[in-house]
Every structure is written in structure tokens, then in C-alpha cells.
């Protein structure tokens, strides 16, 4: 609340999906974000023609706002069922892999985790950024195949508390699932506790731990024939 009382601004795009009413209640009514901070807040059967996928392509309205003039201090979006999230600063995008690493590095800033966490896990396709953080904090770090069930097994056996994947999913053992609003609130807590911007937090993280570079290819709107050829080529090269 103090963050917003001091003039902090944010833009949260609910993408006409399920998180809209929750976001309005949490961010604007409880925390005091300025009215209008939450956009596309009404859940619609067709998502208002939007594709509720929180990435740089489908959350274009949010991205344009955050990279434009007079951008809010913080930007975020969740997907159709609220489990995935995207984090942005002014003219700055945080990759899901870096977000997981930064969340893990700052767990002690959050009251619920100040007494410690069990460990962390990432999908095999997610960068090693979180692994370096885990090593510094003397926490176990697991790499698992793609599929949330593998994270759940680790949470159930109390081996991890946080987990995430490069496809914008981040979660915690508090519900054993991906939780997009939880991730957004975690970032707001980091900002409030440190007094730093999204970019400053991320740049300082890179300076301390190094930066991981990786590449993801998304093929949109291609024919089945082309998709089959891509799969065959991937198999040929061991992908």
C-alpha cells in the first residue's frame, strides 16, 4: 500500500480472462493502485477477441504501453486461467527464467518465506539462471522434464518451494500450482522492499550472478505440413 501511496504506477492486463475481478480487488481496491491500473478486466467468453497469452506477441497492448512515453513503473499480465505471468518495467522485459531466479534470490524479503525455503526447480528448457542463485544460497536446484506434475512431486516431498518454466509459468508450494497473481505480488514486494525499479533489480542481479542467454522459437499460424517438416528436422538434429 505504501508503494502506491507514494505515487508508484502499474499497468496490469487481465486480457479479458479469469483474473480480472481478482486483480481489481487486489491491486486497485486493497493495495491502492490508481483507478484504471487494471485493464481488460472483464472476463469474456471469447476474451474480447484477444489471445490471452502473456508474452511479447499477444500482450502487445501492454508491451506498447510499457515501451511508450510516460510508461507506468511496472507492467504485468496473466493468461486465460491466471497461472502464467509476464513482468515488465519501463522499456524493459524480464524473461521468465530471470524472473524465477530473481524471485528465488529475494525470497527473504517476503514474510511467508523469511524463515527459509526448501529449494527450487526449473524445467529442462528454462535457463540456468536460477541454478546459480540456488548455489549461492546453498539450496537444492532440480531440472525436470516439461510438465507441471514433476514440480508437484518435488513439492509434495518438501524438496522445493519455488518452481518455474520458460513458458511464463511460476509457482510455489502454497498451492502446488502456477499462480500468476502470486508472481506479480512477489515482484511488487521486491520493488517495495528495495525501492528499485524492475530494470535496476534485474541489472543488479545480472551483475551479481551473470546473465544467461537462450533462445526460444515460436512458430505461429503454420500449416500442418510445415509443422511436420519442422518436427522431422528437429528429430534429425536431436532436438
Residue ranges and their predicted role:
Residues 196-239:
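Catalytic-core signal marking the mid-to-C-terminal active-site face
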Residues 1-208:
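Phosphate-binding chemistry for phosphorylated carbohydrates and sugar-nucleotides
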Amino acid at each position: 500500500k505504501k508503494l502506491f501511496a507514494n505515487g508508484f504506477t502499474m499497468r496490469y492486463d487481465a486480457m479479458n480472462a479469469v483474473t480480472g475481478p481478482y486483480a481489481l480487488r487486489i491491486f486497485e481496491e486493497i493495495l491502492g493502485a490508481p483507478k484504471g491500473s487494471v485493464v481488460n478486466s472483464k472476463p469474456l467468453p471469447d476474451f474480447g477477441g484477444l489471445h490471452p497469452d502473456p508474452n511479447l506477441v499477444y500482450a502487445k497492448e501492454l508491451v506498447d504501453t510499457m515501451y511508450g512515453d510516460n510508461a507506468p513503473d511496472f507492467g504485468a499480465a496473466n493468461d486465460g486461467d491466471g497461472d502464467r505471468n509476464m513482468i515488465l518495467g519501463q522499456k524493459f522485459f524480464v524473461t521468465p527464467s530471470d524472473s524465477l531466479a530473481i524471485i528465488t534470490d529475494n525470497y527473504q524479503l517476503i514474510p511467508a518465506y523469511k524463515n527459509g525455503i526448501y529449494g527450487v526447480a526449473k524445467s529442462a528448457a528454462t535457463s540456468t539462471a536460477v541454478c546459480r542463485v540456488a548455489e549461492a544460497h546453498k539450496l537444492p536446484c532440480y531440472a525436470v522434464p516439461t510438465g507441471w506434475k514433476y514440480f508437484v512431486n518435488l513439492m509434495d516431498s518438501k524438496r522445493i518451494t519455488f518452481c518455474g518454466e520458460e513458458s511464463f509459468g511460476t509457482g510455489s508450494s502454497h498451492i502446488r500450482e502456477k499462480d500468476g497473481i502470486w508472481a506479480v505480488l512477489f515482484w511488487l514486494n521486491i520493488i517495495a522492499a528495495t525501492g528499485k525499479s524492475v530494470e535496476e533489480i534485474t541489472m543488479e542481479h545480472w551483475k551479481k550472478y551473470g546473465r544467461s542467454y537462450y533462445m526460444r522459437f515460436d512458430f505461429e499460424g503454420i500449416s500442418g505440413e510445415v509443422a511436420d517438416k519442422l518436427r522431422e528436422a528437429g528429430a534429425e538434429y536431436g532436438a
